[in-house]
Protein backbone atom coordinates (compact mmCIF):
# COMPACT_ATOMS: atom_id res chain seq x y z
CA UNK A 1 0.00 0.00 0.00
CA UNK A 2 1.34 3.43 -0.91
CA UNK A 3 1.10 5.90 1.94
CA UNK A 4 0.08 9.54 1.71
CA UNK A 5 2.77 11.90 0.37
CA UNK A 6 3.24 13.34 3.84
CA UNK A 7 4.35 9.92 5.13
CA UNK A 8 6.24 8.48 2.17
CA UNK A 9 9.66 7.34 3.35
CA UNK A 10 8.94 8.41 6.93
CA UNK A 11 5.97 6.41 8.20
CA UNK A 12 4.99 7.54 11.70
CA UNK A 13 4.94 3.88 12.87
CA UNK A 14 5.24 0.37 11.50
CA UNK A 15 3.36 -2.76 12.65
CA UNK A 16 6.57 -4.82 12.74
CA UNK A 17 8.28 -2.50 15.22
CA UNK A 18 8.99 -3.55 18.78
CA UNK A 19 5.59 -3.49 20.61
CA UNK A 20 6.82 -1.08 23.29
CA UNK A 21 8.06 1.41 20.68
CA UNK A 22 5.02 0.88 18.50
CA UNK A 23 2.70 1.55 21.44
CA UNK A 24 4.20 5.01 22.01
CA UNK A 25 4.25 5.95 18.32
CA UNK A 26 0.77 4.62 17.62
CA UNK A 27 -0.98 6.32 20.54
CA UNK A 28 0.77 9.58 19.69
CA UNK A 29 -0.35 9.33 16.05
CA UNK A 30 -3.98 8.58 16.98
CA UNK A 31 -4.28 11.67 19.18
CA UNK A 32 -2.58 14.06 16.78
CA UNK A 33 -3.74 13.15 13.27
CA UNK A 34 -6.96 13.56 11.36
CA UNK A 35 -9.54 11.05 10.21
CA UNK A 36 -8.33 11.48 6.62
CA UNK A 37 -4.76 10.66 7.60
CA UNK A 38 -5.96 7.59 9.49
CA UNK A 39 -7.81 6.34 6.42
CA UNK A 40 -4.76 6.94 4.23
CA UNK A 41 -2.80 4.55 6.46
CA UNK A 42 -5.67 2.12 7.00
CA UNK A 43 -3.78 -1.15 6.42
CA UNK A 44 -0.86 -0.02 8.60
CA UNK A 45 -3.27 0.94 11.37
CA UNK A 46 -5.18 -2.36 11.27
CA UNK A 47 -1.93 -4.35 11.28
CA UNK A 48 -0.50 -2.23 14.12
CA UNK A 49 -3.57 -2.63 16.33
CA UNK A 50 -3.50 -6.39 15.73
CA UNK A 51 0.20 -6.51 16.56
CA UNK A 52 -0.26 -4.51 19.78
CA UNK A 53 -3.30 -6.53 20.85
CA UNK A 54 -1.49 -9.82 20.27
CA UNK A 55 1.48 -8.56 22.27
CA UNK A 56 -0.44 -7.19 25.25
CA UNK A 57 -3.94 -8.71 25.43
CA UNK A 58 -4.12 -11.07 28.40
CA UNK A 59 -0.45 -10.69 29.37
CA UNK A 60 -0.21 -6.91 29.95
CA UNK A 61 -3.76 -5.67 30.57
CA UNK A 62 -2.67 -2.14 31.46
CA UNK A 63 -0.83 -1.73 28.13
CA UNK A 64 -3.65 -3.33 26.18
CA UNK A 65 -6.02 -0.90 27.89
CA UNK A 66 -3.93 2.00 26.54
CA UNK A 67 -4.30 0.57 23.03
CA UNK A 68 -8.05 0.06 23.43
CA UNK A 69 -8.61 3.52 24.90
CA UNK A 70 -6.70 5.12 22.00
CA UNK A 71 -8.77 3.22 19.45
CA UNK A 72 -11.99 3.97 21.32
CA UNK A 73 -11.05 7.66 21.48
CA UNK A 74 -10.57 7.81 17.70
CA UNK A 75 -13.80 5.87 17.12
CA UNK A 76 -15.80 8.54 18.94
CA UNK A 77 -15.16 10.87 16.03
CA UNK A 78 -18.39 11.53 14.08
CA UNK A 79 -16.49 10.97 10.82
CA UNK A 80 -16.11 7.27 10.07
CA UNK A 81 -12.53 6.06 9.74
CA UNK A 82 -10.59 2.83 9.84
CA UNK A 83 -10.34 3.34 13.62
CA UNK A 84 -13.99 2.34 13.88
CA UNK A 85 -13.15 -1.04 12.37
CA UNK A 86 -10.27 -1.45 14.83
CA UNK A 87 -12.58 -0.51 17.70
CA UNK A 88 -15.18 -3.08 16.63
CA UNK A 89 -12.51 -5.75 16.20
CA UNK A 90 -11.28 -5.18 19.74
CA UNK A 91 -14.84 -5.50 21.04
CA UNK A 92 -14.88 -8.89 19.33
CA UNK A 93 -11.55 -9.82 20.90
CA UNK A 94 -13.11 -9.08 24.27
CA UNK A 95 -16.12 -11.26 23.47
CA UNK A 96 -18.58 -8.36 23.28
CA UNK A 97 -20.37 -9.72 20.20
CA UNK A 98 -23.75 -8.09 20.76
CA UNK A 99 -22.13 -4.69 21.41
CA UNK A 100 -19.96 -5.03 18.32
CA UNK A 101 -22.87 -5.96 16.07
CA UNK A 102 -25.03 -3.14 17.47
CA UNK A 103 -22.21 -0.59 17.12
CA UNK A 104 -21.52 -1.79 13.58
CA UNK A 105 -25.05 -0.85 12.57
CA UNK A 106 -25.44 2.24 14.77
CA UNK A 107 -22.23 3.76 13.41
CA UNK A 108 -23.20 2.85 9.83
CA UNK A 109 -19.65 1.73 9.23
CA UNK A 110 -20.71 -0.19 6.11
CA UNK A 111 -21.60 3.10 4.37
CA UNK A 112 -18.13 4.56 4.67
CA UNK A 113 -15.52 1.82 4.94
CA UNK A 114 -13.98 0.33 1.74
CA UNK A 115 -15.37 -3.07 0.80
CA UNK A 116 -12.02 -4.86 1.19
CA UNK A 117 -11.64 -3.71 4.81
CA UNK A 118 -15.31 -4.39 5.50
CA UNK A 119 -14.88 -7.94 4.19
CA UNK A 120 -11.88 -8.56 6.43
CA UNK A 121 -13.77 -7.28 9.45
CA UNK A 122 -16.85 -9.44 8.83
CA UNK A 123 -14.67 -12.53 8.33
CA UNK A 124 -12.77 -11.72 11.52
CA UNK A 125 -16.06 -11.36 13.37
CA UNK A 126 -17.31 -14.71 12.05
CA UNK A 127 -14.13 -16.45 13.20
CA UNK A 128 -14.44 -14.97 16.67
CA UNK A 129 -18.05 -16.08 16.99
CA UNK A 130 -17.17 -19.60 15.84
CA UNK A 131 -14.32 -19.73 18.34
CA UNK A 132 -16.81 -19.03 21.11
CA UNK A 133 -19.47 -21.42 19.75
CA UNK A 134 -21.83 -18.55 18.90
CA UNK A 135 -23.08 -20.13 15.68
CA UNK A 136 -26.05 -17.81 15.19
CA UNK A 137 -23.88 -14.68 15.26
CA UNK A 138 -21.34 -16.33 12.96
CA UNK A 139 -24.14 -16.95 10.46
CA UNK A 140 -25.00 -13.23 10.48
CA UNK A 141 -21.42 -12.20 9.70
CA UNK A 142 -20.97 -14.79 6.93
CA UNK A 143 -24.31 -13.75 5.44
CA UNK A 144 -23.19 -10.10 5.49
CA UNK A 145 -20.05 -10.89 3.48
CA UNK A 146 -22.15 -12.16 0.58
CA UNK A 147 -23.67 -8.69 0.17
CA UNK A 148 -20.49 -6.59 0.30
CA UNK A 149 -20.00 -4.94 -3.13
CA UNK A 150 -16.94 -6.18 -4.97
CA UNK A 151 -15.56 -6.21 -8.50
CA UNK A 152 -13.74 -9.51 -7.95
CA UNK A 153 -14.95 -12.47 -5.91
CA UNK A 154 -12.32 -13.89 -3.58
CA UNK A 155 -11.78 -17.03 -1.52
CA UNK A 156 -13.34 -15.07 1.38
CA UNK A 157 -16.64 -14.86 -0.51
CA UNK A 158 -16.50 -18.57 -1.33
CA UNK A 159 -15.82 -19.41 2.30
CA UNK A 160 -18.65 -17.17 3.46
CA UNK A 161 -21.04 -18.83 0.99
CA UNK A 162 -20.51 -22.42 2.06
CA UNK A 163 -19.97 -21.53 5.74
CA UNK A 164 -23.29 -19.70 5.97
CA UNK A 165 -25.28 -22.43 4.22
CA UNK A 166 -23.66 -25.24 6.22
CA UNK A 167 -24.11 -23.41 9.53
CA UNK A 168 -27.73 -22.77 8.65
CA UNK A 169 -28.50 -26.42 8.02
CA UNK A 170 -26.48 -27.42 11.10
CA UNK A 171 -28.52 -25.17 13.37
CA UNK A 172 -31.95 -25.54 11.76
CA UNK A 173 -31.93 -28.72 9.71
CA UNK A 174 -33.18 -26.68 6.74
CA UNK A 175 -31.67 -25.27 3.54
CA UNK A 176 -31.53 -21.49 3.16
CA UNK A 177 -32.33 -20.16 -0.30
CA UNK A 178 -29.98 -17.26 -1.07
CA UNK A 179 -31.57 -14.58 -3.26
CA UNK A 180 -29.43 -13.77 -6.29
CA UNK A 181 -31.70 -10.82 -7.14
CA UNK A 182 -30.43 -8.78 -4.19
CA UNK A 183 -26.72 -9.41 -4.64
CA UNK A 184 -24.63 -9.72 -7.78
CA UNK A 185 -22.26 -11.98 -5.81
CA UNK A 186 -24.69 -14.84 -5.20
CA UNK A 187 -25.24 -16.20 -8.72
CA UNK A 188 -21.56 -16.60 -9.76
CA UNK A 189 -20.80 -18.08 -6.33
CA UNK A 190 -23.68 -20.52 -6.65
CA UNK A 191 -22.33 -21.77 -9.98
CA UNK A 192 -18.98 -22.47 -8.35
CA UNK A 193 -20.50 -24.06 -5.23
CA UNK A 194 -22.40 -26.93 -6.85
CA UNK A 195 -20.83 -29.56 -4.52
CA UNK A 196 -22.27 -27.75 -1.50
CA UNK A 197 -25.68 -27.32 -3.10
CA UNK A 198 -25.72 -31.06 -3.82
CA UNK A 199 -24.66 -31.81 -0.24
CA UNK A 200 -27.51 -29.71 1.16
CA UNK A 201 -30.07 -31.33 -1.13
CA UNK A 202 -28.82 -34.80 -0.21
CA UNK A 203 -28.88 -33.89 3.49
CA UNK A 204 -32.61 -33.32 3.22
CA UNK A 205 -33.22 -36.42 1.09
CA UNK A 206 -31.73 -39.62 2.55
CA UNK A 207 -28.54 -41.02 4.01
CA UNK A 208 -27.58 -43.09 0.95
CA UNK A 209 -27.71 -40.07 -1.36
CA UNK A 210 -25.78 -38.12 1.26
CA UNK A 211 -23.03 -40.76 1.35
CA UNK A 212 -22.75 -40.72 -2.44
CA UNK A 213 -22.44 -36.92 -2.59
CA UNK A 214 -19.83 -36.82 0.19
CA UNK A 215 -17.75 -39.51 -1.52
CA UNK A 216 -17.96 -37.67 -4.84
CA UNK A 217 -17.03 -34.24 -3.48
CA UNK A 218 -14.81 -35.06 -0.48
CA UNK A 219 -11.64 -33.90 -2.25
CA UNK A 220 -13.31 -30.52 -2.91
CA UNK A 221 -14.34 -30.21 0.75
CA UNK A 222 -10.76 -30.97 1.78
CA UNK A 223 -9.41 -28.39 -0.66
CA UNK A 224 -11.80 -25.73 0.68
CA UNK A 225 -11.01 -26.69 4.28
CA UNK A 226 -14.75 -27.05 4.93
CA UNK A 227 -14.61 -30.57 6.35
CA UNK A 228 -15.14 -29.35 9.92
CA UNK A 229 -18.56 -27.98 8.94
CA UNK A 230 -19.36 -31.11 6.89
CA UNK A 231 -18.51 -33.41 9.80
CA UNK A 232 -20.45 -31.22 12.23
CA UNK A 233 -23.47 -31.40 9.92
CA UNK A 234 -23.18 -35.19 9.86
CA UNK A 235 -22.91 -35.31 13.65
CA UNK A 236 -26.23 -33.51 14.11
CA UNK A 237 -27.91 -35.25 11.16
CA UNK A 238 -29.66 -37.84 13.41
CA UNK A 239 -30.94 -35.05 15.67
CA UNK A 240 -32.67 -33.29 12.78
CA UNK A 241 -34.15 -36.57 11.54
CA UNK A 242 -35.48 -37.34 15.02
CA UNK A 243 -37.08 -33.90 15.24
CA UNK A 244 -38.78 -34.51 11.91
CA UNK A 245 -40.03 -37.95 12.95
CA UNK A 246 -41.27 -36.63 16.29
CA UNK A 247 -43.52 -34.17 14.44
CA UNK A 248 -44.93 -36.92 12.22
CA UNK A 249 -45.07 -40.13 14.27
CA UNK A 250 -45.99 -41.15 17.81
CA UNK A 251 -43.85 -44.30 17.58
CA UNK A 252 -41.44 -45.97 15.18
CA UNK A 253 -39.63 -49.27 14.86
CA UNK A 254 -35.99 -49.04 15.91
CA UNK A 255 -35.22 -51.14 12.84
CA UNK A 256 -36.72 -48.43 10.61
CA UNK A 257 -34.70 -45.67 12.28
CA UNK A 258 -31.48 -47.69 12.00
CA UNK A 259 -32.17 -48.31 8.32
CA UNK A 260 -32.87 -44.62 7.67
CA UNK A 261 -29.58 -43.66 9.33
CA UNK A 262 -27.69 -46.62 7.79
CA UNK A 263 -26.38 -47.81 11.15
CA UNK A 264 -26.91 -50.76 13.47
CA UNK A 265 -29.85 -50.84 15.89
CA UNK A 266 -27.49 -50.68 18.89
CA UNK A 267 -25.82 -47.53 17.56
CA UNK A 268 -29.21 -46.06 16.64
CA UNK A 269 -30.41 -46.60 20.20
CA UNK A 270 -27.33 -44.80 21.61
CA UNK A 271 -27.84 -41.87 19.25
CA UNK A 272 -31.53 -41.58 20.13
CA UNK A 273 -30.72 -41.52 23.84
CA UNK A 274 -28.10 -38.83 23.17
CA UNK A 275 -30.34 -36.47 21.21
CA UNK A 276 -33.82 -37.19 22.58
CA UNK A 277 -34.23 -38.21 26.22
CA UNK A 278 -38.02 -37.92 26.02
CA UNK A 279 -38.42 -41.34 24.42
CA UNK A 280 -39.22 -44.86 25.60
CA UNK A 281 -38.19 -48.17 24.11
CA UNK A 282 -40.72 -50.99 24.19
CA UNK A 283 -40.65 -54.54 22.85
CA UNK A 284 -43.62 -56.04 21.00
CA UNK A 285 -43.64 -59.24 18.95
CA UNK A 286 -39.88 -59.41 19.24
CA UNK A 287 -39.36 -55.95 17.74
CA UNK A 288 -38.13 -52.79 19.49
CA UNK A 289 -40.27 -49.69 19.16
CA UNK A 290 -39.40 -46.10 19.95
CA UNK A 291 -42.22 -44.06 21.50
CA UNK A 292 -42.00 -40.28 21.41
CA UNK A 293 -43.22 -39.01 24.76
CA UNK A 294 -44.72 -35.56 25.20
CA UNK A 295 -42.14 -32.87 25.88
CA UNK A 296 -42.01 -31.25 29.31
CA UNK A 297 -44.04 -28.14 29.98
CA UNK A 298 -42.04 -24.93 29.88
CA UNK A 299 -41.46 -23.44 33.33
CA UNK A 300 -41.63 -19.64 33.91
CA UNK A 301 -37.83 -19.58 34.17
CA UNK A 302 -37.40 -21.49 30.92
CA UNK A 303 -40.00 -19.27 29.27
CA UNK A 304 -38.02 -16.19 30.30
CA UNK A 305 -34.77 -17.68 28.97
CA UNK A 306 -36.41 -18.67 25.69
CA UNK A 307 -37.88 -15.20 25.29
CA UNK A 308 -34.46 -13.65 25.85
CA UNK A 309 -32.90 -16.01 23.29
CA UNK A 310 -35.65 -15.11 20.83
CA UNK A 311 -35.02 -11.39 21.38
CA UNK A 312 -31.27 -11.84 20.77
CA UNK A 313 -31.92 -13.95 17.67
CA UNK A 314 -34.34 -11.31 16.41
CA UNK A 315 -31.75 -8.56 16.93
CA UNK A 316 -29.15 -10.55 15.00
CA UNK A 317 -31.60 -11.15 12.17
CA UNK A 318 -32.64 -7.49 12.04
CA UNK A 319 -28.99 -6.44 12.06
CA UNK A 320 -28.20 -8.68 9.11
CA UNK A 321 -31.22 -7.35 7.20
CA UNK A 322 -30.18 -3.72 7.89
CA UNK A 323 -26.65 -4.41 6.72
CA UNK A 324 -27.95 -6.17 3.63
CA UNK A 325 -30.26 -3.22 2.92
CA UNK A 326 -27.45 -0.68 3.30
CA UNK A 327 -25.10 -2.58 1.03
CA UNK A 328 -27.82 -3.27 -1.54
CA UNK A 329 -28.60 0.47 -1.58
CA UNK A 330 -24.96 1.19 -2.32
CA UNK A 331 -25.04 -1.26 -5.23
CA UNK A 332 -28.16 0.31 -6.71
CA UNK A 333 -26.75 3.82 -6.26
CA UNK A 334 -23.63 2.82 -8.20
CA UNK A 335 -25.75 1.34 -10.99
CA UNK A 336 -27.88 4.48 -11.22
CA UNK A 337 -24.82 6.73 -11.34
CA UNK A 338 -23.01 4.56 -13.87
Swiss-Prot record:
Q: Which InterPro entries match?
A: CSN3 (IPR050756), PCI_dom (IPR000717)
Q: Keywords for this entry? A: Cytoplasm, Nucleus, Signalosome
A single Gene Ontology biological process assigned to it is: ubiquitin-dependent protein catabolic process
Q: Where in the cell is it found?
A: Cytoplasm; Nucleus
Q: Name one GO cellular component term.
A: prospore membrane
Chief site of localization? cytoplasm
Q: List each copy of the PCI domain by range.
A: 137-306
Chain's role:
Component of the COP9 signalosome (CSN) complex that acts as an regulator of the ubiquitin (Ubl) conjugation pathway by mediating the deneddylation of the cullin subunit of SCF-type E3 ubiquitin-protein ligase complexes.
Q: How does it assemble?
A: Component of the COP9 signalosome (CSN) complex.
Which family is it part of?
Belongs to the CSN3 family.
What name does the UniProt record give this protein?
COP9 signalosome complex subunit 3
Whose protein is this, by species? Schizosaccharomyces pombe (strain 972 / ATCC 24843) (Fission yeast)
